[in-house]
């Protein structure tokens, strides 16, 4: 009988132990396990979100880089066009200035040539008059001298 009482005592003690564990030990363990499961699930969800965010950021960075390259190429193209325009304007301005200087030089040369011709005509007229005076050995009055010079200048 002793065996039966021991078995009943052990059964009662086991039942009390199970009840005590279910009442006081099991709930905190289950709470800890559930909290750990929740943290792990949240961590995995955060990791998935981070991977998606990283992919979006990389795609956005790639798009921005492409856009920046396009913008840079446009700016370079505009700068090259502007450079060509400035060069053409400078060439046109230089050609105009060159033509102006050439025309001015030609005008100065023509004016100097005319002045030299006029001086030469006057000198020739003076020499002709002096030669005529010596030949005629007489002096011509200034009014007659002026008329002769003017006629001689017109003829030359």
Swiss-Prot record:
Q: Which domain of life is it from?
A: Bacteria
Q: How does it sit in the membrane?
A: Single-pass membrane protein
> Where is it mainly found?
membrane
Gene Ontology, cellular component aspect: plasma membrane; proton-transporting ATP synthase complex
A GO molecular function annotation here is: proton-transporting ATPase activity, rotational mechanism
Subcellular localization: Cell inner membrane
Regarding protein family, the annotation reads:
Belongs to the ATPase B chain family.
Q: What is this protein called?
A: ATP synthase subunit b
């Amino acid at each position: 009988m002793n065996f039966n009482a021991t078995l009943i005592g052990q059964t009662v003690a086991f039942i009390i132990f199970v009840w005590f564990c279910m009442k006081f030990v099991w709930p905190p363990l289950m709470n800890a396990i559930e909290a750990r499961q929740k943290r792990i699930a949240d961590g995995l969800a955060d990791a998935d979100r981070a991977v998606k965010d990283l992919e979006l950021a990389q795609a956005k960075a790639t798009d921005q880089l492409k856009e920046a390259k396009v913008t840079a190429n446009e700016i370079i193209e505009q700068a090259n066009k502007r450079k060509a325009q400035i060069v053409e304007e400078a060439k046109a301005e230089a050609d105009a200035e060159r033509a102006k200087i050439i025309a001015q030089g030609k005008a100065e040369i023509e004016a100097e040539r005319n002045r030299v011709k006029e001086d030469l005509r006057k000198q020739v007229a003076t020499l002709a008059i002096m030669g005529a005076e010596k030949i005629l050995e007489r002096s011509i009055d200034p009014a007659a001298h002026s008329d002769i010079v003017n006629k001689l200048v017109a003829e030359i």
